[in-house]
Amino acid sequence: MINALTYEEMIKKINNNYIERGLRNDYIGVFITRPDLESGKNILNSLDYYHHLTGRNVNFYLPGFGSYWGENYPDKETVAKIDGTEWYFSNEQFVKFTRKLERKTKWVYSGESELILLPLIDGKIEFDKILIFYLDDMLRDGAIKSVSAFFQQLSRLFESKSTLSEIHVDLRKDNAIELIKGAILKNLPYGIGDVITRGNYFVIMN
């Protein structure tokens, strides 16, 4: 998990990964949630763990979250501590981030927890097609046991060399986002992919 107080900060970190690590073709996860949502608390209560778990395989950015803020954000609240450093959340910055992402895409924030996947192709985010998991709908209908269990499964999926190879190759194709969706759903364990597909919890928006 990577803090992204603002949209601009997320883009800066993505560009740094491109320059420093050569990540030209990748997938970017944006975990839209708030501390007052039960589905968000599920991850925030173990944020230190998921920060280390997912950082090796896929970057999940957390809008409205950050560290080392000083007194610049009067609405900040402490939500977690990672490697001894306090992380904060700002509703104001969260709203600014989601509104900017709405302007960049056809996505409209539901008010609940969502996971958005954006393809990074030749070092640039492709905003014309995005993948969205509606996490609260998945929880209510029993498609997943918990958000934390789902992120654990996604992390295992992204650790798979065969899955990563499949996704990276698909990124360069015209129907990349459809192929990536298929690769993710196919490799989720315990038939979860079939359940998610039938329930329309995972959509392509363009």
Locate each region found by the language model.
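N-terminal leader/targeting and pre-domain segments
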Residues: 1-25, 146-171
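Local sequence-structure signature of Cys/Sec-based thiol-disulfide redox active-site neighborhoods
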Residues: 2-83
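Well-ordered, non-membrane alpha-helical segments in soluble/globular domains
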Residues: 7-11, 37-50, 87-101, 140-154
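Thiol/disulfide oxidoreductase modules built on the thioredoxin-like
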Residues: 97, 101-111
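A short, hydrophobic beta-strand/beta-hairpin element that forms part of a small beta-sheet core
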Residues: 107-130
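Membrane-inserting effector segments that mediate pore formation, membrane fusion
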Residues: 168-206
